[in-house]
């Protein structure tokens, strides 16, 4: 199978977690599929939420929702540094007393992911591949909102193959429901053997993978990033590419 890979990075990012009546806005810890599709929609020149009107979905999501992607954090333990940024909001509806209200956002810092896109035989896939290979973006690309410029580099086209083994480390974010747990190597006495050569880590977060067709609210799945060996359950979306194992979703 043909796979488009590129590195996506930025100095800061903000992927807002929906909150009601809150003046501290928190960010998801990673770019998620819906936000990534929005960025790809900007590459293609598709409309967003502001131009949705009465349509079921915003244009970028309607056209790109069936694209299979995989997201691989480019750091050692799955967590980026975070910092609270404070803004002054003096619009009339922000404060019933008419004063200045501080709005706080949690920004991710120095973010970087490898992004994988499974290329199918459709016109949208072909155009997306051509645009990214040639850095021909219709609109400016951002990491969540327009305070956070995104950079794409290291673009390459790779060949992947289905991965059907029962146990493996997984190098991308993957769905928790796709595994049966984690493999524990036994020592000669039948006890779990410790790997003293490295520290194991496990990052888990509920991240948006789709939009609800009526409310357009995020539909989330528990995703994991870890260096532990996993026991695979549903192998249909796992792929081996460049000697790494990733899951498409």
Q: Can you name each region flagged by the protein language model?
A:
Residues 1-3, 66-68, 110-114:
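Extracellular structured ligand-interaction cores
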Residues 18-91:
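Glycine/small-residue-rich interface belts in oligomeric ring/scaffold proteins
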Residues 7-9, 70-72, 116-118:
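Residue-level recognition of well-ordered beta-strand positions that form the cores
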């Amino acid at each position: 199978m043909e796979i488009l890979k590129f590195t996506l990075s930025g100095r800061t990012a903000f992927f807002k977690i929906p909150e009601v009546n809150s003046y501290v806005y928190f960010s998801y810890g990673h770019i998620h599929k819906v936000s990534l599709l929005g960025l790809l929609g900007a590459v293609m020149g598709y409309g967003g939420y502001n131009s949705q009107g009465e349509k079921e979905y915003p244009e970028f999501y309607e056209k790109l929702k069936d694209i299979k992607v995989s997201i691989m954090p480019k750091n050692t333990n799955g967590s980026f540094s975070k910092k609270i940024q404070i803004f002054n909001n003096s619009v009339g509806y922000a404060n019933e007393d008419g004063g200045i209200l501080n709005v706080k956002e949690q920004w991710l810092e120095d973010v970087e992911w490898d992004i994988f896109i499974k290329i199918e035989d459709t016109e949208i896939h072909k155009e997306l591949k051509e645009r990214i290979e040639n850095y021909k973006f219709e609109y400016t690309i951002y990491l969540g909102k327009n305070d956070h410029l995104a950079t794409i580099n290291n673009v390459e086209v790779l060949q992947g193959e289905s991965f059907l083994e029962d146990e493996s480390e997984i190098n991308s974010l993957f769905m928790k429901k796709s595994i049966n747990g984690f493999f524990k190597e036994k020592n000669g006495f039948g006890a779990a053997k410790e790997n003293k050569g490295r520290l194991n880590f496990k990052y888990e977060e509920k991240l948006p993978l789709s939009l609800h067709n009526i409310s357009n609210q995020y539909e989330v799945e528990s995703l994991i990033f870890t260096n532990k060996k996993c026991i695979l359950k549903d192998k249909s979306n796992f792929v081996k590419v460049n000697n790494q194992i990733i899951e498409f979703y």
